[in-house]
Amino acid sequence: MQVEELGKIIRARRKVLNLTIGELSEYTGLSRTTISDIELGKTNPRLDIITEIFRFLNLEMKIEVRQIK
């Protein structure tokens, strides 16, 4: 998944839940700028940050590991 697509998913879910960037920022401890940059695909967040955001937004993430031939 591309960072832009990830950001769109996070932003769309946040809006469905009627949450502000500020509220998401308070929960995750990330700055509003960082949340905005993630939503706009301007940064590539670490997996632990994505996990924390997904937890708050009640989203599930599935990681699939495949062997490259």
Language-model features and meaning:
Residues I9, E23, T34-D37, I49:
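Residue-level recognition of specific faces of alpha-helices
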Residues K8-S25:
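Short basic helix-loop element that most often maps to the first helix and adjoining turn
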Residues G29-T43:
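Recognition helix of helix-turn-helix/homeodomain-like DNA-binding domains
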Residues D48-E64:
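DNA major-groove recognition helix of helix-turn-helix/homeodomain DNA-binding modules
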Residues M1-E5:
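A detector for short, charged/polar N-terminal pre-domain segments
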Residues Q67-K69:
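Short acidic DE-rich linear segments
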